[in-house]
Design a protein with these regions (language model features):
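Primary recognition of RNase H-like, Mg2+-dependent phosphodiesterase/nuclease domains
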Residues: 1-151
Length: 151
């Protein structure tokens, strides 16, 4: 896993931005680890989720290493492991998306919105995916077709 998300810290290092401070807390530079794990906003999101992620246990960990450790520690034969990781990645994505709406649309910080969105997205995905493979509605036969011909 490479550190290639355009965080403000990376944009500052690249000379694209002058300011690397996290727009969520204005306290530390926005690295991926800060944005997803260490920022008080991210901590509130994880704390409010049902995923048992205790970000107070993290201090100098890179988010990439945390994910690798998490993936390696899971028993993939155990029921619910895939759903758990799906929820982890959905929460990460929702934090990123919320940060973007705060920065680009002036939206107010709302950890509850992140928590609820990250909980409902997997359900919405499953619903859409299951609807794609549900039986199609049978169409009626054209009037010029004999009754014994089926489609």
């Amino acid at each position: 896993m490479h550190d290639c998300l355009p965080t403000l810290q990376l944009l500052k290092i690249s000379g694209i931005s002058d300011d690397g401070l996290c727009p969520m807390c204005n306290y530390e530079e926005e690295s991926t680890s800060h944005l997803f794990l260490l920022c008080p906003f991210a901590r509130a999101c994880w704390h409010g989720s049902s995923l048992a992620v205790h970000t107070t246990d993290f201090s100098d960990i890179f988010v990439q290493q945390w994910l690798i450790n998490l993936i390696n520690a899971l028993n993939w034969n155990e029921e619910g492991s895939f759903d758990y990781m799906q929820s982890i990645f959905t929460t990460l994505w929702t934090i990123w998306l919320h940060k973007d709406t705060v920065v680009h649309e002036g939206k107010q910080l709302n950890p509850i919105e992140v928590i609820l969105t990250s909980q409902t997205l997997p359900c919405r995905y499953k619903e859409v995916f299951s609807n794609q493979y549900s039986p199609l509605i049978t169409r009626s036969k054209p009037s010029n077709e004999p009754n014994n011909v089926t489609r």
